[in-house]
């Protein structure tokens, strides 16, 4: 008889829940709930389990916020809870709450070739560190290493490192944004809101007044080639994504590959392919050759957060991935 665990991927807007086959890691019965419709994460979980008429004893939920102890307070939502209390209330034997990019990193060993699109570099080196990052509402970052037959995710808040300009134009953008918001992190330019910041700074640098555009508007106008400023913003976004990925590669020697997740890049895949992304990734001066062969992959799996939550839980329960 198949034994299932509950897995989840929870963001500021939606909570996506599914079942994970503990033996194989296969994800099934995924369903998305609006976080605004429920008073707590526990309430959503109860609804899901009732709807699917299933009993589970183990669970792993990935959440888009730092996880530093028993008390979890979501960054972009009002939900807050004690992990131990929720585990007790649900009657679970085991409940893991992990960072969303910890989950994405743990999905990488489970991905198949059809889930990946490669952007330059050679083959990944087995056993070497891996980096994963992705732009969405924010900028998530994690690393993954293989130690004693176990995958170990190294979570952090790498999206909040300083934005480091490397051209005159990027320097001007930094100054404009710094005057507006103070500290300018990488997330302030590599995210949905970050794309808007780039567009606004490009227009303001030319002493013009920017329109009140959303990320979707900027992307659509850039792809339609109907707005020079939007196209420049999207081009610069791709270049800065490359610089940032190259920095991750240098920091931990990620010869196991650099992986891009998040919902933004797949929306303009052909544009991204033709952009200055890879050139910027390798633009490391004296260390250009060091990063030259490091492969970059775009993750195109539908639910890497769910897949990785399942992988994390299965490994915790003693399975070898």
UniProtKB/Swiss-Prot annotation:
According to the UniProt record, one GO cellular component term is:
cytosol
**Which parts of the sequence bind ATP?**
8-13
- Provide the protein's localization: Cytoplasm
- Identify the main location: cytoplasm
Which GO molecular function entries does the Swiss-Prot or TrEMBL record give? ATP binding; D-glucose binding; glucokinase activity
Q: What is its EC number?
A: 2.7.1.2
A family per Pfam: Glucokinase
Key words, A-Z? ATP-binding, Cytoplasm, Glycolysis, Kinase, Nucleotide-binding, Transferase
Give the catalytic activity: D-glucose + ATP = D-glucose 6-phosphate + ADP + H(+)
- At the top level, the lineage of the source is Bacteria
Would the keyword Nucleotide-binding be found if you checked this record's keyword annotation? Answer: yes
Name the Gene Ontology biological process terms: glycolytic process
Tell me which family the UniProt entry assigns to this protein: Belongs to the bacterial glucokinase family.
What's this protein's name?
Glucokinase
Record the organism: Escherichia fergusonii (strain ATCC 35469 / DSM 13698 / CCUG 18766 / IAM 14443 / JCM 21226 / LMG 7866 / NBRC 102419 / NCTC 12128 / CDC 0568-73)
The record's gene field reads glk
């Amino acid at each position: 008889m198949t034994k299932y665990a509950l897995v989840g991927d929870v963001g500021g807007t939606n909570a996506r829940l599914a079942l994970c086959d503990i033996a194989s890691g296969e994800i099934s019965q995924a369903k998305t709930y609006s976080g605004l419709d429920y008073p707590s994460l526990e309430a959503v979980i109860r609804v899901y389990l009732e709807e699917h008429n299933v009993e589970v004893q183990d669970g792993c939920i990935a959440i888009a916020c730092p996880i530093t102890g028993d008390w979890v307070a979501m960054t972009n939502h009002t939900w807050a809870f004690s992990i131990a209390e929720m585990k007790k209330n649900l009657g679970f034997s085991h409940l893991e709450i992990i960072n969303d990019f910890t989950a994405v990193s743990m999905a990488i060993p489970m991905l198949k070739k059809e889930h990946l699109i490669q952007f330059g570099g050679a083959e990944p080196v087995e056993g070497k560190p891996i980096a994963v990052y992705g732009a969405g509402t924010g900028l998530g970052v994690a690393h993954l290493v293989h130690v004693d037959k176990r995958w170990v995710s190294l979570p952090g808040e790498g999206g909040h490192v300083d934005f480091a300009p490397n051209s005159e134009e990027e320097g001007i953008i930094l100054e404009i944004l710094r005057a507006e918001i103070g500290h300018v992190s990488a997330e302030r330019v590599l995210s949905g809101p970050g794309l808007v910041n780039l567009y606004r700074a490009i227009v303001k640098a030319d002493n013009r007044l920017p329109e009140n555009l959303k990320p979707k508007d900027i992307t659509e106008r850039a792809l339609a080639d109907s707005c020079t400023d939007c196209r420049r913003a999207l081009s610069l976004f791709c270049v800065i994504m490359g610089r940032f990925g190259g920095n991750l590669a240098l920091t931990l020697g990620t010869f196991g590959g650099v992986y891009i997740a998040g919902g933004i890049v797949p929306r303009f895949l052909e544009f991204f392919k033709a952009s200055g992304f890879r050139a910027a990734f390798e633009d490391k001066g004296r260390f250009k050759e060091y990063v030259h062969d490091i492969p970059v992959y775009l993750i195109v799996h539908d639910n890497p957060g769910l897949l990785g939550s399942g992988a994390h839980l299965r490994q915790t329960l003693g399975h070898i991935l």
